[in-house]
């Protein structure tokens, strides 16, 4: 495997359009929202005062992916009612968390270790508690996304 220079760069005027143009494979399109939709969601969520962080994932100067997370302690408005009504949710409700909301590597750059390294850096960023302490980190993924599940489980 080639040596990587993976790092996270906050979304800005210089990189947002390139991030919007990133794509996953056809099979993966049902696993993650488009980056354009994700940035719109981030804008709306942040306009309500929720801390949202959106990053381009870069290898050197090349944008290879996108990651977005938020901080909160309230799940009001969350789309997955099945989870909100679960016993597991009751354990977490009202406790501060970081939610890895979006995570993707462009189809041209998959299989090179960029996902693993950038996910590690995402967790390292969260450990700085940029919006305050949190008791847990949560993410969601489609059950058919076997590659994503394997990646996330490798971090515990």
Indicate residue ranges for each PLM-predicted region.
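Acetyl-CoA-dependent GNAT
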Residues: 2-108, 119-121, 125-131
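Conserved beta-strand-loop-alpha-helix junction that forms the acyl-donor binding cleft
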Residues: 133-149
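Residues forming the Rossmann-fold NAD(P)(H) cofactor-binding site
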Residues: 116
């Amino acid at each position: 495997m080639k040596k990587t220079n993976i790092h996270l760069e906050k979304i800005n005027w210089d990189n947002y359009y390139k991030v919007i143009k990133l794509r996953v494979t056809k099979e993966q399109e049902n696993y993650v929202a488009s980056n354009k939709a994700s940035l719109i969601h981030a804008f709306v969520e942040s306009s309500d005062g929720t801390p949202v962080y959106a990053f381009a994932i870069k290898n050197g100067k090349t944008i290879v992916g996108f990651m977005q997370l938020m901080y909160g302690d309230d799940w009001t408005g969350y789309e997955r009612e099945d989870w909100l009504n679960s016993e597991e949710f009751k354990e977490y409700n009202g406790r501060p968390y970081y939610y890895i909301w979006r995570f993707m590597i462009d189809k041209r750059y998959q299989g090179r270790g960029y996902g693993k390294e950038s996910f590690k850096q995402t967790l390292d960023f969260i450990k700085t508690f940029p919006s305050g302490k949190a008791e847990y980190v949560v993410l969601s993924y489609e059950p058919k996304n076997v590659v994503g599940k394997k990646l996330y489980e490798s971090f515990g």
